[in-house]
Design a protein with these regions (language model features):
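Nucleic-acid 5′ end/cap handling module spanning
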Residues: 42-46, 59-62, 81-238
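Covalent nucleotidyltransferase
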Residues: 1-94, 238
């Protein structure tokens, strides 16, 4: 990522705004998470990762910790994008080839409108949507309802052929699920301790060999479900 960290315009921005931390991620539309994370870990050959882009969507200013989201985005538009000639990507526009850009925000209210934008962005090659309360300050190192991620997960049924206990036994167990071609993947079941303990206790007689519904974000380059969760066994399909 040398081409990003040594970008002259980015260095100039930080020199002018030493108390600001940019919040963004490495992303290239059309590339899978597996491809992006693999390129980001490269150290020996910078040319193999010089296609990575840095998308900025928020910032934190230690000199003004009460700056609300709408003010932070206006700051990024004026002091980051306009002042240093970083492009702003807005939905529906042609995408710039610039390695660093600001992701455009859209004001929206109501779940139906949020879902509409989410679906539009996913169909355009993005992962989902992030909803931010424009009247709230940036929260560092904590989860809060100021920022909510929306991701539409896929759902399919897979045969369960085994299980693995975790470091805490059944509490962080995973089920071994089988794909149509015989390959397997691990999926963590949804449920409390009692449910998971029951899964282990009765696996051989009740669950082994049966279909279960798994939700997952997408398929990896190798055709394996990513971020899989086993939601429920589908005895009704048998």
């Amino acid at each position: 990522t040398v081409h990003l960290r040594t970008n002259p315009a980015l260095l100039a921005f930080f020199k002018e705004n030493p108390t600001v931390i940019l919040d963004g991620e490495l992303f290239v539309r059309g590339k899978t998470l597996q491809q992006l994370s693999g390129a980001a870990r490269m150290e020996k050959n910078a040319y193999d990762c010089d296609w990575l882009q840095y998308w900025v969507y928020d910032c934190y200013n230690s000199a003004d910790i009460d700056m609300i989201a709408s003010e932070r985005y206006k700051f990024l538009e004026d002091k980051f994008a306009e002042a240093h000639n970083f492009p702003i990507y807005r939905s529906g526009e042609d995408e710039s080839e610039a390695p660093i850009r600001l992701l455009g925000h859209e004001y929206v209210s109501g779940w139906d409108n949020m879902k509409k934008l989410h679906d539009e962005w996913v169909s355009a090659g993005f992962e989902g949507a992030v909803i931010t309360d424009p009247s709230k300050p940036y929260k560092v190192g904590s989860r809060c309802n100021n920022l909510i991620k929306i991701k539409q997960y896929k759902s399919e049924d897979f045969k369960v052929i085994g299980y693995k206990l975790g470091l805490r036994g059944s509490e962080d167990m995973t089920f071994t699920c089988e794909l149509e071609d015989g390959r397997t993947f691990e999926a963590m079941p949804v449920g409390n301790r009692e449910i998971k303990a029951e899964y282990v206790e009765n696996f051989e007689t009740k669950y082994k060999g049966h279909k279960a519904e798994c939700t997952f974000f997408n398929y990896s380059d190798d055709g394996i479900p990513t971020q899989p969760k086993l939601r429920i066994f589908r005895f009704d399909l048998e």
